[in-house]
Amino acid sequence: HPINIHQVLDRVKALAANGVADGLILTDDYDPSLPPAYGDEDQLIQIFLNLVKNAAEAAHARGDGRGAITIHTAYRHGVKVRAAKGHVLRGAPLEVRIQDNGPGVPAHLRESLFQPFVSTKTHGAGLGLALVAKLVAGHGGLIDFESEPGRTTFRVLLPIASGEDTPA
């Protein structure tokens, strides 16, 4: 279905602001010209709420009351994702970046961060990012991240809702 990604992200922000992101600076930097995304709204909310929840936990870990999360959107021309079936390259130009100013992902976890049972937390099963990666792939998208002390950014690339770019 065609989905307004900004409506999804605004719902995620509202849910997070009253919960995990309480006490954090939560801002957005949206590209107003984005076309609709292709996808399942509930799954997209699940994807981004999980990423914002992780970002909030990282930002709170600063312990100085200055934790912040920024949600960016952009259109990236020419980004292609290889589809599993038939190895067709599919456009995934919608970019959503969720950035926090927490301590960063420990180096020893970076290679396996999207695997099940890998976690930076002492509590929890470590299934969050594995599920996020599976849901993103199911949408014909891509997820990656960059991390350094003081900043981690998760980037999700999604297809737009048009005949040629929607997964079969």
Label for each model-derived stretch:
Residues 36-39, 120:
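Conserved micro-motifs of the catalytic ATP-binding
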Residues 66-79, 90:
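Short beta-strand/loop element within the Bergerat-fold HATPase_c
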Residues 10, 23-35, 74-76:
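Conserved catalytic submotifs in the C-terminal HATPase_c
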Residues 136-137:
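Detector for a conserved hydrophobic position within an alpha-helical segment of the HATPase_c
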Residues 89-93, 105-116:
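Short conserved segment of the HATPase_c
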Residues 128, 132:
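Short alpha-helical Gxxx[C/S/T] motif in the catalytic ATP-binding
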Residues 1-13, 72-74:
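A conserved beta-strand-to-alpha-helix junction within the catalytic ATP-binding
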